[in-house]
Amino acid sequence: MALCLILLPTSGAFADVGAADEALPAAVKATAADEKTKPALPVPVNAKAALLMDASGGQILAQTGAHEKLFPASVTKIMPLLLVMEAFDRGELQLTDTVKVSADAAKKGGSQIWLKEGETMTVDELLRAAAIYSANDACTALGEHLAGSEEAFVAALNRRAKELGMNDTNFVNGTGLDDTTDEHLTSAYDVAVMSRELLKHPLILNYTTVWMDSLRGGATQLVNTNKLVRTYPGITGLKTGTTNKAGCCVSASAKRDDLQLIAVVLGSPTSNDRFDGAKALLNWGFANYAALTPKLDPALVPPVAVLRGTEETIQPVLPQIAPVVLKKGEEGKLQQEIQLAVDVQAPVEEGQALGKVIYSIGGKALAEYPLTAPESVGKMTFGEMFRRLLGALGK
């Protein structure tokens, strides 16, 4: 299979988000080597670890202690919320489903809505309690309903973490309570990864952006533990957490125009420190970065010849291209490289890779998207080959 390469500057709609004051994308990860140097952040953040990530492509824009294993407290709940969203996508769960509260869920300490054993609530109500108020009993009830038991749910949390490449993470529970364990750990990088995945589900914003709500006919008041929801322009969530071991933690996400950022702060000594740190990171990100949505000209992606196929050519499907995050002023430096097969051998499967589009600056890849076959193409039989040959000779 031969390849043709096309390298050219991009054109696109540039979204200048202004100063703050809110596909196969290639993630730029912090490495173990980064940990040895403990990089300085561009803004003051009083925390054990902090990180700013572009939610579109997964680029790390700033970090310190990104892979240091720390207690996350209730920031843990991002993963249970993700599993609930994915269960909705699979049709395994509905917002109107009713959940009967178990004795174990009712006994959960810490932040709670005082669920009683045998009490019933809808999935929607439990989601509101878990996402807005960080209720441990509601989160546990959701997990038990989804997986059958808390143990099975924790196993599912850890499986999903491994699938996402969260190699610094070990969940002991779905709440973040750490008073009886020293093994419930994650990192700022892993928190950003699961936050980014959760933000792919727009439904979650119906919960994480709510400042105040109520349950039980107004008898139970819910106030969001993330005070940035009330004060920060463009905020989309996401989750706070506080324990004696973890300190004060937050994963804060915000979006302005096409630029969505995730600021993770772990191990701050006070609540104000975590919010000030997250806000400072977001402000710096919006002031210094912007989103460019490249335009891929269909004329640059010609049909690919299919050798011995029932069709002579196949037209690759153009990918849906997400915004690429760049330093402001670098939009003219973005290059688009198209790698496309000249021909492929039949049979061709639907979705088969025929090439890819790579966006880069100075040789550093920022995002990569596949060019795929829209449908299957079968292999010609001997009779079909003979008829095609006769047809060609007769012209």
Report residues per predicted region:
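Bacterial N-terminal signal peptides
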Residues: 1-9
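Generic recognition of cysteine residues
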Residues: 4, 139, 248-249
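Domain-terminus/edge residues, biased toward the C-terminal soluble/receptor-binding domains
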Residues: 166, 170, 182-395
